[in-house]
């Protein structure tokens, strides 16, 4: 595992975007695994800026998103489909038919998960997987206690994750309780993994996940077993680690 220290959120975002852009330049038809949430937004903004300058071409890129809320239409502003289009896809020349996000409106969980696994396998896997890091160590929506052998599945979100997502909704009752997510096995099958972390509130979980024991109680700890993981984190998130 390689850890890159960034000065602040802006620096973290730029360093992460550099890694993603290098992947696109080296392999124009690459498969990128993408994440949502607040942490990756800065990296997406930087990628858009480089695209607008003519430095990046997304026309051959394929994307696979980690997760989607169950029961929310993709046109809803709270859906991850909406998020990805707003933050990235609508601003670059990626072909929409090459962007994949779990179908949150598929009522049959088994069908939704099987369909998504089929897409991932058909594409030959992910070249570079982008991840955020939850306060409880979740990656994607893989909550503490989840088995490492899972591929795509329907998850009941933890109370902590629901509370963390409340800031995006008008009321707590509106926050979805379930989501479709790529499992740990799917994430770990990526050729390369990039984790972005920012803020002093993530310092404890950075130390626990990346320097503590490997355990399902801390899903992100499994990343210690992957042979090509880069963590880009700002100084606040790394504040509990030795220099």
Annotate each language-model stretch with its function:
Residues 1-32:
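N-terminal glycine-/serine-/threonine-rich phosphate-binding loop
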Residues 38-39, 69, 133-138, 144, ...:
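Short glycine-rich anion-binding loops that position phosphate/pyrophosphate groups of nucleotides
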Residues 56-129:
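Ligand-binding beta-strand-loop-alpha-helix segment within the catalytic cores
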Residues 45-57, 80, 144-153, 212-214:
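A glycine- and small-aliphatic-rich helix-loop capping segment at beta-alpha/alpha-beta transitions
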Residues 185, 189-243:
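ATP/nucleoside-binding phosphotransfer catalytic cores, i.e., glycine-rich phosphate-binding loops
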Residues 26-52:
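Glycine-rich N-terminal segment of FAD-binding domains in flavoprotein oxidoreductases
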Residues 136, 140-184:
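Class I SAM-dependent methyltransferase SAM-binding "motif I" and its flanking Rossmann-like core
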Residues 33-37, 65, 102-103, 130-133, ...:
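Short beta-strand segments
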């Amino acid at each position: 595992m390689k850890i890159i220290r960034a000065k602040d959120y802006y620096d973290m975002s730029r360093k992460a975007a550099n890694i993603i852009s290098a992947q696109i330049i080296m392999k124009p038809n690459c498969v990128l695994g993408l994440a949502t949430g607040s942490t990756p937004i800065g990296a997406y903004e930087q990628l858009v800026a480089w695209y607008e300058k003519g430095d990046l071409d997304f026309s051959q890129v394929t994307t696979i998103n980690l997760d989607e809320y169950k029961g929310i239409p993709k046109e809803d502003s709270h859906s991850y489909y909406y998020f990805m289009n707003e933050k990235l896809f609508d601003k670059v020349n990626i072909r929409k038919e090459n962007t994949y996000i779990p179908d949150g409106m598929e009522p049959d969980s088994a069908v939704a998960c099987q369909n998504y696994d089929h897409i991932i396998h058909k594409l030959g896997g992910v070249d570079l997987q982008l991840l955020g890091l939850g306060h409880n160590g979740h990656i994607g929506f893989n909550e503490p206690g989840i088995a490492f052998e899972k591929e795509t599945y329907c998850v009941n979100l933890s109370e902590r994750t629901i509370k963390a997502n409340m800031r995006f909704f008008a009321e707590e009752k509106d926050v979805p309780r379930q989501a479709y997510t790529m499992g740990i096995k799917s994430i770990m099958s990526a050729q390369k993994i990039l984790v972005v972390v920012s803020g002093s509130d993530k310092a404890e979980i950075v130390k626990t996940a990346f320097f503590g024991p490997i355990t399902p109680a801390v899903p992100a700890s499994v990343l210690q077993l992957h042979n090509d993981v880069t963590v880009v984190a700002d100084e606040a998130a790394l504040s509990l680690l030795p220099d």
